[in-house]
Amino acid sequence: MSLEAIVFDRSEPENVSVKVLDQLLLPYTTKYVPIHTIDDGYSVIKSMQVRGAPAIAIVGSLSVLTEVQLIKHNPTSDVATLYSLVNWESTKTVLNKRLDFLLSSRPTAVNLSNSLVEIKNILKSSSDLKAFDGSLYNYVCELIDEDLANNMKMGDNGAKYLIDVLQKDGFKDEFAVLTICNTGSLATSGYGTALGVIRSLWKDSLAKTDKADSGLDNEKCPRMGHVFPLETRPYNQGSRLTAYELVYDKIPSTLITDSSIAYRIRTSPIPIKAAFVGADRIVRNGDTANKIGTLQLAVICKQFGIKFFVVAPKTTIDNVTETGDDIIVEERNPEEFKVVTGTVINPENGSLILNESGEPITGKVGIAPLEINVWNPAFDITPHELIDGIITEEGVFTKNSSGEFQLESLF
């Protein structure tokens, strides 16, 4: 990818720098927001300038690291005044409260919760601020490096599993897949979760095409030939972000509206064989919280006999909550639903309209009566009955003969 969601300069372990891509401005504007404090981390997560469960956990953790290093190196800074730095126990008390505040930015995403629990454990066992800084730095680096490695594993696990299933079913042709929201490089440390599987499927398809063209392999076999990303209202992560990643990677794709899924399945010239979605939280029985619209996609896939897969690392699995009924679903500001935010386009020639600094102008356009009541949940819960498999870095988990997932080995 030409864009990184998170830029983490770790060349000086005791003086790191962090900036995150403002994803609200994509695909037309590239702007990075510096992260110096926990307040900065809270702000970019809450405003959805950064999104995607893995990326949220990484940015949240990095914001703790940058704040700790800021108060250590600059004890007279504004944020340092929140702490009693001469007393380590008092400092730990304030930090714990700050971590709770950070968690409130996105309570549905279990990755952030898990990371902050781990940071609290590190804090508890640290003898002073310097020791905490060093241990926290090591933890954050490991979190980022493992996320990227696990994304690659998930991609390959999911691609291999789907190809094997299609071959067992006797399918030997080109197929298409569906996806919702954004689960790629912009939602993670790189490569992606659900979009990572799609990337691996595309690599597999290119390899098979090369073999066939060279005459090394004339046997027909299943290969992914097209992707249908959903626009993903109301924040349009599919049209703004996933479409951008697919275009950049030159993966054949066609953007569709959230309301056209069923008709696209019925009329697609290439048979749609699977849907891959990410997850913000998977509970013990496999029920999954993900971007609003995921449930309707799962229901439609069930109706048409299309395989529906959730792709997420182990860190997204909540080993305490039993069912999706107990997941707290965040509701967004109703006003976000009444407007569309985008880049201003010249209606005559389709070019971007720029400001005096040469940057594209963004604006909001009202699309609903201001007086109308709005329900705007950020997520929905897909019951495990509608999920055919959960793809992790450990492999693909399917349901037993009783129709239940057994995720205990991941806990």
Swiss-Prot record:
The record marks C181 as: Transition state stabilizer. Its main location: cytoplasm. GO terms for cellular component: cytoplasm; nucleus. It is found in: Cytoplasm; Nucleus. GO terms for molecular function: S-methyl-5-thioribose-1-phosphate isomerase activity. SUPFAM superfamilies: NagB/RpiA/CoA transferase-like. Its EC number is 5.3.1.23. The modification N-acetylserine is found at S2. The modification Phosphoserine is found at S351. It is an enzyme of class 5 (isomerase). InterPro entries: IF-2B-related, IF-M1Pi, IF_2B-like_C, Initiation_fac_2B_a/b/d, M1Pi_N, NagB/RpiA_transferase-like. Transmembrane segments: none annotated. It catalyses: 5-(methylsulfanyl)-alpha-D-ribose 1-phosphate = 5-(methylsulfanyl)-D-ribulose 1-phosphate. Homodimer. Belongs to the eIF-2B alpha/beta/delta subunits family. MtnA subfamily. Present with 922 molecules/cell in log phase SD medium. This is Methylthioribose-1-phosphate isomerase. It comes from Saccharomyces cerevisiae (strain ATCC 204508 / S288c). The gene is MRI1.
